[in-house]
UniProtKB/Swiss-Prot annotation:
GO terms for biological process: regulation of membrane protein ectodomain proteolysis. Keywords: Cell membrane, Disulfide bond, Glycoprotein, Membrane, Transmembrane, Transmembrane helix. Residues 1-17, 83-92, 254-268 are cytoplasmic. The keyword Membrane applies. One of its GO terms (cellular component) is plasma membrane. Part of TspanC8 subgroup, composed of 6 members that interact with the transmembrane metalloprotease ADAM10. This interaction is required for ADAM10 exit from the endoplasmic reticulum and for enzymatic maturation and trafficking to the cell surface as well as substrate specificity. Different TspanC8/ADAM10 complexes have distinct substrates. Promotes ADAM10-mediated cleavage of CD44. Seems to regulate VE-cadherin expression in endothelial cells probably through interaction with ADAM10, promoting leukocyte transmigration. This is Tetraspanin-5. It is found in: Cell membrane. Palmitoylated.
Length: 268
């Protein structure tokens, strides 16, 4: 007479190692971002003089790497170790942290839609504040140059915003050779030229507006960004929805694994 053995609850290996594998990648990406951020700060001498963090008048792009890298590192660590060691505390922390990020993203999206005019004004102030600090930090300078080249724009709402910078303003007291000019990233590109002419923006704003349009981009970066957003709204919305679904999926998997672990422990 053969007896039937009762098979108790088990932890799903598929869910466990899927969460582990996904978060290992996330963890290493976080370490890479943090490493890039710390390396950039070391190159600037920030690590040897922490007080210099507050010296920059504009936005330091290195903060993006440090913040994003820090969040990815914490999430990756909690998800990876929590799944591998079947640690319910870390898995619950992973779920809650991911849920908070999802809630903040959702809130930011709603607020951006409701207060879009206010967001537009803040973006204008943000860009102009960084225009003032254009020469203060090489990373900020590269970010502004990339933005203006990519969007084919100049300043927040136009080339005259560069009057805010001490090197490019048109005042009589400005002895800079760049006086009444714009950075090279504002210049229209000639496909026949392989070498970038870094002096192409000199004296550009002293010319009549009709002549300016031939030499430099006259549209501001805020209107150009709005236009790009309208033209690519479906793609942008799809990306955000995809990220949101991945976050929900991650929360559900982590909670499912927690339930399996607690069920197994309860059967002991």
């Amino acid at each position: 007479m053969s007896g039937k053995h009762y098979k108790g609850p088990e932890v799903s290996c598929c869910i466990k190692y899927f969460i582990f594998g996904f978060n290992v990648i996330f963890w290493f990406l976080g370490i890479a971002f943090l490493g890039i951020g710390l390396w950039a700060w070391n190159e600037k001498g920030v690590l040897s003089n922490i007080s210099s963090i507050t010296d920059l008048g504009g936005f330091d792009p290195v903060w993006l790497f440090l913040v994003v890298g820090g969040v990815m590192f914490i999430l990756g660590f909690a998800g990876c170790i929590g799944a591998l060691r079947e640690n319910t505390f870390l898995l619950k922390f992973f779920s809650v942290f991911l849920g908070i990020i999802f809630f903040l993203e959702l809130t930011a999206g709603v607020l951006a839609f409701v207060f879009k005019d206010w967001i537009k004004d803040q973006l204008y102030f943000f860009i102009n504040n960084n225009i003032r600090a254009y020469r203060d930090d090489i990373d900020l300078q590269n970010l502004i140059d990339f933005t203006q080249e990519y969007w084919q724009c100049c300043g927040a709402f136009g080339a005259d915003d560069w009057n805010l910078n001490i090197y490019f303003n048109c005042t009589d007291s400005n002895a800079s050779r760049e006086r009444c000019g714009v950075p090279f990233s504002c210049c229209t590109k000639d496909p026949a030229e392989d070498v970038i002419n870094t002096q192409c923006g000199y004296d550009a704003r002293q010319k009549p507006e009709v002549d300016q349009q031939i030499v430099i981009y006259t549209k501001g970066c805020v209107p150009q960004f709005e236009k790009w957003l309208q033209d690519n709204l479906t793609i942008v919305a799809g990306i955000f929805i995809g990220i949101a679904l991945l976050q929900i999926f991650g929360i559900c998997l982590a909670q499912n694994l927690v339930s399996d672990i607690e069920a197994v422990r309860a059967s002991w």
